Amino acid sequence: MNVLDEIVLNTKSKLEVMKSKTSLEELISQATKLKIEKSNFKASLASKDQAIIAEIKKASPSAGIIIEDFDPVTKAKEYESFGASALSILTEEDYFLGSTKYLKDVKKIT
């Protein structure tokens, strides 16, 4: 089994556990209560001659920890100053050491 297969298998297992704890109806109910401003991803990419999607991640299965003193907000600001059109923020916890908190933190400054 390669790493990608392992990640998929692990993620499916975690999703099954989560689904057993919270119903789809409850998730939909929670999501509809959130006040999330929508962005236009396609327009962000189309607005420039060369669009760059910058990736924010602490680690990867192949490289291990990439940034020891990782701060997703600092990285987002850095990428923005370099002209990134959009951000890809890894939230997968086991292999990329991500967190959904990264999304919330970066959303506050973008």
Please report, for each region that a protein language model flagged, where it lies by residue:
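Alpha-helix-loop-beta-strand connector modules within alpha/beta enzyme cores
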Residues: 36-53, 97-110
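Residue-level signature of catalytic and energy-coupling elements of molecular machines
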Residues: 7, 54, 79
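Hydrophobic faces of well-ordered beta-strands that scaffold small-molecule active sites
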Residues: 52-56, 87-89
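Active-site-proximal loop/turn and secondary-structure-junction residues that shape catalytic pockets
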Residues: 58-60, 91-95
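Alpha/beta enzyme core
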Residues: 68-90, 109
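N-terminal positively charged helical leader segments and presequences
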Residues: 1-49
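Active-site mouth loops of central-metabolism enzymes
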Residues: 56-71
